[in-house]
């Protein structure tokens, strides 16, 4: 994973990372400086992906930091072009690029209309997610999801301060709500182990010894 934290310092990144974990994955990379779209960003990302071929996700935080403006007087065309450049790069290298972007301060009946900029941004992406807090600092929010290959969903979330994660507060409509008890036991067991190396048979034996 490559995370472009373009609004943070390395000290702030380190502080936040230590709040989440004491053992960050070796495959997690950070950068605080990047060129703009059409001004070297594509080459920088391509070089990184060549050096780290196992990369599957690039996070750009925020989108505005890599935009360079245009002489064109068509904002929609500018927005669509910028996103299309990044999408082409993602498709070429078979990775996902997650763009963090600001919302308008004005509410809208359609959450997707709250994405700052024109509809050229949401129109060029594969998927769009809008996280809208019930009120600032409440820790309660709804994640609105839409995309070309996913159904529209509204997911109620609550922020878990102990793990610095957003958690789903109720089952997603239409999904299976009953979970195999053995799957629950296995999940809890693996969380307790932290990590495991071995065969499926060895894992099964450990689980049986633990649960009886």
Where are these regions (language model features)?
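Conserved inter-motif catalytic segment of the P-loop NTP-binding fold
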Residues: 1-88, 148, 161-164, 169, ...
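Phosphate-binding/switch region of NTP-binding enzymes
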Residues: 4, 57, 77-165
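DNA transaction DNA-binding modules
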Residues: 157-212
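Hydrophobic beta-strand residues in large extracellular and virion-surface proteins
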Residues: 28-30, 45, 143, 157, ...
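Conserved, well-folded catalytic cores of nucleic-acid-processing
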Residues: 16, 20-23, 66-69, 89, ...
């Amino acid at each position: 994973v490559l995370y472009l934290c373009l609004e943070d310092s390395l000290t702030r990144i380190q502080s936040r990372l230590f709040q989440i974990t004491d053992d960050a994955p070796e495959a997690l990379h950070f950068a605080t400086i990047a060129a703009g779209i059409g001004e070297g960003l594509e080459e920088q990302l391509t070089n990184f992906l060549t050096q780290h071929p196992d990369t599957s996700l690039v996070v750009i935080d925020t989108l505005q930091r890599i935009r360079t403006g245009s002489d064109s007087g068509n904002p929609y065309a500018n927005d669509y072009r910028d996103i299309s450049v990044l999408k082409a790069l993602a498709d070429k290298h078979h990775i996902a690029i997650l763009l963090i972007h600001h919302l308008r301060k004005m509410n809208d009946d359609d959450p997707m209309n709250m994405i700052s900029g024109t509809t050229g941004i949401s129109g060029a992406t594969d998927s769009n997610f809008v996280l809208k807090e019930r009120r600032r600092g409440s820790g309660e929010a709804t994640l609105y999801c839409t995309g070309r290959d996913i159904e529209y969903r509204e997911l109620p979330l609550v922020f878990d301060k102990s793990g610095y994660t957003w958690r789903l507060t109720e089952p997603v409509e239409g999904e299976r709500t009953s979970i195999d008890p053995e799957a629950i036991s296995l999940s809890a067991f693996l969380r307790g182990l932290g990590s495991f190396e071995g065969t499926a048979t060895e894992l099964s034996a450990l689980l049986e010894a633990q649960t009886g």
